[in-house]
Every structure is written in structure tokens, then in C-alpha cells.
């Protein structure tokens, strides 16, 4: 009965001890403890060919050994993406990657896998970049990277935000931007707890705590925490003002300065405080204003203990103790601890008065002065004397009046 089940083997024992051979070859009398080893051995007598590696020709007595061998061998061919040059060892991963390109350009047919040649592989390993921009000469190792770069020169921005209409040259920038609308801020600062929607902004913010300023101006040696600040600063040396107002023709060195200026013409103040009704031109000003109502002041000076609602205010305050005045007027040499103070001061030389009253047309060099002036038209008098009840439009007038009661 047992021999009919295993016609080519001979059972040595009914219940063998662990590790003892139980399968005997009828041809050469060699014994085996595992059936699969015995079966593979029989092929040496029958002349049956062992599994062979198609890559190097190596034979293996067992299929499992061949599988292990194949895993250890470097793959000769990869699947290379014709769009961006990225290579994959497995076809499935390659096809999944291809969907990124077809989603952006649904009208295009899918690219077929291109086996990666030795020349292309060497090109990527050696850093060769055969795709050069005709406008600026910058080179790339993938054609799709060049196409994305060229949008900088053409101004093409095909990816538009459905929330605010802002457009971007690349899909990845749109995805990052959309975090602003969702309110999602997954990147949190371990020092102060401030959260950001983008990791890049957190990295830049952390330099406030570390004091790191990796971007240095070769002209004057001044350093900055972010590259965009350095580029904007360098325009103070070159005099370049690439951003021009379409309404009045005034030019600015920074885009944010132009955006801020343009609100003068349209009178836009879209951000309103729910507590007191004060309106602001920019969301950041509203956020800063909210601290007045909450009274929160998380940033404290180590020298005198004074606390502030914003870290930027603390940084400016610390300069009182250090005497640091990094912002100097090139015309008269007067120095300031804040860049905004220098900006206002410069208007005393240029005569610039960018803040105009919509009621009477009178112009002012500072927005705060315009705000005070507007109370003449609105009749607003927020400062009231506790002694006699008389009200004033300006705090300084209120303080001067109170001296009457003191004397």
C-alpha cells in the first residue's frame, strides 16, 4: 500500500526520528529527509533540465533557489517614463506613475513603457541634463521638467484655484495653496506652537528662533532668513522696481507692496473684526488685531519681562535693549529699528503721500494719519474725558485736555 503511494521511494522507518532520512533513491541509494529535495534529485537521473536564469544562464536544482537567485540579480531593464525620465523596475509601478501625467493632460494617449538603455541610465547617474531652456539656458534631465520651467517665461498658469481664482504654473503649487482655504495647518513649530499649511513656511519661520540667516547680500553683507527677502533687498542696490500700478503708474520693488498700494485706489477693506467692527485691508492685520480683544501676549522679553502678542513685535522691542538699528536712510544717515519706520521716514525726503482721503482728496504719508483724518468726516470721537464727558477724535487731544482737570 505504501509503495503504491510512493513508487520511486523506499520507506525506511514507519516513524522516523527528527532529521532522519526517509526517502531513498532507487538509482544511487542516496537518502533525503524532505520530499521536494528527493524529487529534484530524481531529475539528475531522468535527464530533465533544471530551471535556468534567462539573465545569466545559471542553473538551479530547485525552483525556489532560482527565485532567490533572480531576486539577488540587478535588473537589466527598467521602465523609463518618456515624460519626466523617472525609471521603474516594475511595470505596475510605472503604469501608476504614468497616471500623474495623463491626469494633467487627459487628451494625450498613454505612453508605452520604454526600456531604459545603458546610455539613458548613465545619463541620469552622471547628472547629464540634455534638455536646456532656450530663454535662460537652465538644463533639466527630463523633458517634462523643462516644459514646467518654460511656463515661468511664458507666464502660463493652467492650474486655477476654484476658491479664489488664483492660478499657478504647476499642479503641486495649487495643491499647497488650497491648504489656505481648507484651514489645514499640519506643520507646527515646537518653539512657539505656531502652525503652517506648508512645510517650507515652517522651516523659514524656525529661523526666527534659531537666528539663522543663510541668504547674504554680496553688496552690503546684510543677511536674510529667506531668499525672497534677499532678492527684494537687492533691488535697493539696483533700483529695480518691476511692479507697476496700472492706475497711477507708481512702481514698486516688491509685489506685496504693489498689492497693498492698489487697495488705496479701490478702497478695499474686506476683513472685518467680529468683536468691534474694525475693518482691515489684509487678513494678517485682522489676525494681529484680534489679540487686542483676547489680551493674549505669549512672547515675553527676557530683559525686562514685557510681553507681546506677536513675535515680530518682540524682535523689534529687543532692539531697544541692544541698540540695534539695522535700517539706515541713505540720504541723511538716520537709522531705525524697524523697516516700516524707515519707509515712512523716506517719504519726508521724497514727498510721497500715498494715502488719499476719498472724501476731500487730502493725502498723507502714513495710513494711521489718514485714519485720524477720516474722523473729521465721520464725526467719530472715541476718546472721552471721565471728568467732564467731553470727547475727542485723537488720543493726544484727550491727554492734553485732561491736564485742565489736574491743575
UniProtKB/Swiss-Prot annotation:
Residues 115-124 have a biased composition (Polar residues). It comes from the Eukaryota. Keywords: Activator, Developmental protein, DNA-binding, Metal-binding, Nucleus, Repeat, Transcription, Transcription regulation, Zinc, Zinc-finger. Residues 39-51, 100-111 have a biased composition (Basic and acidic residues). Residues 1-21, 39-72, 96-124 are annotated as: Disordered. One of its GO terms (molecular function) is DNA binding. GO terms for cellular component: cytosol; nucleoplasm. PROSITE patterns: ZINC_FINGER_C2H2_1, ZINC_FINGER_C2H2_2. Transcription factor that acts as a cardiac regulator and an effector of alpha1-adrenergic signaling. Binds to PE response elements (PERE) present in the promoter of genes such as ANF/NPPA and acts as a direct transcriptional activator of NPPA. Also acts as a cofactor with GATA4, a key cardiac regulator. Binds DNA. Interacts with GATA4. This is Zinc finger protein 260. It comes from Mus musculus.
